[in-house]
Amino acid sequence: MNKKPYTMRSLASGAALAFLTVMAAGSLISCRSSRPLVTFVVASDLHAQDVPDGRVRMEAVVNAANRQNADFLIELGDFVRLDSAGQRLLRVWEGYAGPKYHVLGNHDVDRYTKEEYTAGMDMPGRYYSFDHGDFHFVVLDGDNMYDGQTYTPYARGNYGSRPSDIDYVDPEQLDWLRHDLAATDKRCILFSHQSIDTQLKNGAAVREVLEAENRRAGRKKVVLALSGHNHSNYTKVIGGITYMQINSASYVWIGKPTQSDRRYPPEVNKKYGLMPYSMSFTRPLYATVTLTRRGAKIKGVQADFVPPVPHEVGLGDSIGVFPLTSSIADAEVRW
């Protein structure tokens, strides 16, 4: 058989073809790695019945989920009550037809037991998990008191008289969390009302469960935890896991007079008793989270304070350790 001899030109052409093939494969892998796998919209601390424009704020969150064709919608607690006014707001929430999830906030059980509230909101339990695509999502319950001997669940506002005992994840739940994480091979993202990094009194014990699972798996398996409660916004990394505080959709609680008479008419301040001690946002706040094989992109809403703004009432840029901000900053997480 007469074989065609290799030449420098044919070798060069072959090398170029091989290089282009490798580059194309690399580009394909890169494209697949950055392709959105799951997108969800998250909001926190709407307090929809306690602000004058609660319905409008809820509609904005629902419209965002619909507009972006989100895979699911989740709120991180302090949402609505179960009375008739709350039911009307829940019909707004139902305007998003996809899966919707709830986290127990402390104010959600100001008038109810956990059993009553979870049943009224059609939640699978006070803590639970679910899968979507390549990801495993875990919802925790920090509405528990501990006096050094006994764990007591929040119920009908009982936590208000025991401020030093609040914000615990109970042992039963910790044990469940340990087994729930170990039972999945998917990357894990957590939701809680009280932050695991700062607010939970036994947050270190919760973080140890998360970090231990990453050590057991030998990879970044638990990657992100989102929380609310403090009406603030920040992102930090502890033990290789990213923790992000999702700001309230509605306002920051200041806890002292904020010259609200310059913000709202007298009838509004009288009807909504939180307003004189709070500072509202000009826009509803929420975030869109896009998950890929490479990481997460969090796109937040930027707003301003309804005047008078913090410096006009003698406030600085934080309340304790929490930033005083009217926005949810964009963030990116790599894994």
Predicted segments — roles?
Residues 2-18:
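Bacterial N-terminal signal peptides that target proteins for export
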Residues 85-183, 205-222, 232-280, 285-290:
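Extended active-site neighborhood of metal-dependent phosphoesterases/phosphodiesterases
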